[in-house]
Amino acid sequence: MDKLRMVGGTPLKGEVVIAGAKNAALPILCACLLTDQPVVLRNVPDLQDVRTMLKLLQEIGVTIDFPSAGDRSYMVLNAAVIKSSEATYEMVKTMRASILVLGPLLARMHSAKVSLPGGCAIGARPVDQHIKGLKAMGATIKIKSGYIQAETKPQSDRLKGASILTDMITVTGTENLLMAATLASGTTVLENAAREPEVGDLAELLVKMGAKISGIGSDRLVIEGVDKLHGAEHSVIPDRIEAGTFLCAVVATGGEITVKHCRPDTLDAVIVKLKEAGLQTEIGPDWIKASMQGRPKAVNFRTSEYPAFPTDMQAQLMTVNAIAAGSSMITETIFENRFMHVQELNRLGADIAIEGNTAIAQGVEKLSGAIVMATDLRASASLVIAGLAAQGETQVDRIYHLDRGYDRMEQKLTLLGANIERIK
């Protein structure tokens, strides 16, 4: 099993190019199921989760071509022939985003059988809002033997437009219902919709495919169903979480980096907090020049839905707070059980206590290298940042979590001067 070994204490310096957004690529890949024509995608990140999704789509019947040898960011997907409407447990257990095939399969094939999802062990993340919305659109749904079995009755019928108010803001729920609604008969209104940029990116692709969607970027999406969608070309938006992770790394280690091919306008909440911590920034349309001198200042923050501070950046900024001057309170409102990295940070010498959904960090001057274990995707990134800032050698085990969401992270850090390597 791969591990990352690093020796901390080197300020980061140089340029880093951000990959496409994992959380946009996964629903966008599923959107190809809505049409029998080719969909051309660019800037798709080469991540374990993406490879898992591509394998699932191939099992369903999608053909996938990579026109440029050695370039997995550019692909052509063709779902002309759907040979199965099932996503098996073996495929879904490793990645909960597999649930995103449910809406497209139900909309186009009028039936779908999808295993209840797996993925990161950071909370229940139930799919009840997906089911509630699809039922409102006329689907008959049963949970049987660990599978969601959905169909329209009679099976030749399309889904029907409906007004849907979800009980909570759900990103994958919004995406599933949005995709399903594009081929429904009539108009669907999604109230309390997620406003994340990745949802907007999916909607932009669907519009290119012939969908009629208004309210993109707002919490109220109106979708006028069409009979058929066609092929399209689309480039996935840059990954704001990867960009934010590198910004946190330079705050923790010091130095000066330029984050290229990013979308600064999607990072407002993160940049505000990092500036509070002491980061100096110069921002262009698709780049951020970031420099840090001295010890960071502790910052309080609270996670919430976009445009507020993202839960996927909580662990990384907590690492900054672990070595900051002062004490801080970090409140997690999105997922329960998302403080599993705290125990590992404390192994490195951090002083962090948990009270309910709040972590209280007393900043220490230095962390000391140790062997630590990644517990989920973003926790693994936080431990890498901690290792880069710590004195001595740190080893992060179970790095497969990191590979699910970061494209060649250790190679990018090496180019910035970090002393880091992947070992077996």
UniProtKB/Swiss-Prot annotation:
One of its GO terms (cellular component) is cytoplasm. Pathway: Cell wall biogenesis; peptidoglycan biosynthesis. Keywords: Cell cycle, Cell division, Cell shape, Cell wall biogenesis/degradation, Cytoplasm, Peptidoglycan synthesis, Pyruvate, Transferase. This is UDP-N-acetylglucosamine 1-carboxyvinyltransferase. It is found in: Cytoplasm. Its EC number is 2.5.1.7. The modification 2-(S-cysteinyl)pyruvic acid O-phosphothioketal is found at C120. The gene is murA. InterPro entries: Enolpyruvate_Tfrase_dom, Enolpyruvate_Tfrase_sf, MurA_subfamily, RNA3'P_cycl/enolpyr_Trfase_a/b, UDP_GlcNAc_COvinyl_MurA. Cell wall formation. Adds enolpyruvyl to UDP-N-acetylglucosamine. UDP-N-acetyl-alpha-D-glucosamine binds at R96, R125, P126, V127, D128, Q129, D312, I334. The keyword Cell cycle applies. It comes from the Bacteria. Belongs to the EPSP synthase family. MurA subfamily. GO terms for molecular function: UDP-N-acetylglucosamine 1-carboxyvinyltransferase activity. HAMAP family: MurA. The active site is at C120. It comes from Polynucleobacter necessarius subsp. necessarius (strain STIR1). CDD domains: UdpNAET (cd01555).
